[in-house]
A protein has these predicted regions:
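Conserved N-terminal substructure of TIR/SEFIR domains
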Residues: 1-41
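Defense-system signaling and execution modules centered on TIR/cGAS-STING-like, death/scaffold domains
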Residues: 7, 11, 110-122
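Short aromatic/hydrophobic-glycine micro-motifs
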Residues: 14-15, 93, 119
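Short, acidic/glycine-rich phosphate-metal binding loop used to engage nucleotide
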Residues: 23-24, 49-51
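Short, hydrophobic, well-ordered secondary-structure elements
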Residues: 41-42, 63
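Cross-kingdom TIR/SEFIR domain
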Residues: 50-116
């Protein structure tokens, strides 16, 4: 899923994707880096699949700092996990069946957000 999102963001839209999941901690606090990266983001994309706790923290921080209107959430149901966690299930997210659905369902939503930002609506 990440490879498809990365291609869409970087190749199709010419933007920089910052993947918080692959940032190394080094000699600094990864949380501090995560918070700075989210605060500096114009758009926030999150994969809610697998209900990873760190992603839930990132989504919460992005809601406060980026705003729901500039966020794109997607979720792929897996065995035993049919919906995102209850506290995110009420938010707008795109349900995908596999990585191919990212191109079909997620890319147009990302374009809508970018268009809204470009004209100052978001």
């Amino acid at each position: 899923r990440l490879a498809v999102i990365k291609r869409i963001v970087e190749q199709d839209f010419g933007l920089q994707l910052i993947d918080l999941g692959t940032k190394g901690g080094g000699t600094y606090s990864i949380r501090d880096l995560m918070y700075r990266e989210i605060e500096a983001s114009d758009i926030f994309i999150a994969d809610l699949t697998s209900n990873r706790h760190n992603v839930m923290v990132e989504v919460g921080y992005a809601i406060k700092n980026v705003g729901l209107e500039r966020m794109l959430l997607y979720f792929e149901p897996m065995e035993g996990v049919e919906k995102p966690p209850f506290d995110l299930n009420g938010f707008r997210y795109e349900q995908i069946a596999d990585s191919n659905d990212i191109e079909i369902k997620v890319k147009p939503k990302l374009k809508d957000i970018l268009d809204g930002v470009a004209v100052g609506e978001l």
